[in-house]
C-alpha cells in the first residue's frame, strides 16, 4: 500500500486553478483522488480541470468557481462539491489574497479587513461547512496552507504575515 494512495478520496481545494493549488490538485488526482478545482474564474477552473483530466486520461477533476470573499459562494462551493463528487474527505484551503503592499501605517482598514476576511474568516466558514460530515464519518482532513510569511516578517506585507501565522 502506498503512503500516497488517495483512491476513493474526494478533495476540495480552494485557489487551485493555478500555482501551488494547481500542483496540489494534480498530485492528489494522480494519486487517485477526485478533486474540485476552485477559484474565482470559471474558465480558468475549467481549463485546469481539463488539463488534469487529459494528463491522467480520466475524469477526476471538476471545476466549481467560488470567490472566497463571498459567504454564499463558499456555501455553494461545498454544496456543489457534494453534488459533483458525493462527499468531502479532505478540504485544502489554499486561496488567499493580499491587496496591499506597503507599511501597515499606510494600509487602509478596508484592505486589512479584506485580508483577514479572505485569508482567515473564509477558512473558518469552509471548516464549519465540512466538519459536521467529517465528524459524522469519523474521518476527514483539513489542511490550511500557510506561507513563509508566517515565520519571516516583511515590512510591506504586514496584514498578510498576520493572516498566515
State where each predicted segment sits.
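Substrate-binding pocket helix/loop in short-chain dehydrogenase/reductase
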Residues: 102-104, 108-116
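Conserved glycine-rich Rossmann-like NAD(P)H-binding loop of the short-chain dehydrogenase/reductase
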Residues: 31-47
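Conserved glycine-rich cofactor-binding loop
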Residues: 10, 15-19
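The beta1-alpha1 cofactor-binding region of Rossmann-like NAD(H)/NADP(H)-dependent oxidoreductases
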Residues: 42, 65-76, 109
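Active-site loop immediately N-terminal to the catalytic Tyr-X3-Lys motif
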Residues: 104-105, 152-158
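Residue(s) in the substrate-gating loop at a strand-loop-helix junction
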Residues: 147
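Active-site helix of classical SDR
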Residues: 127, 163
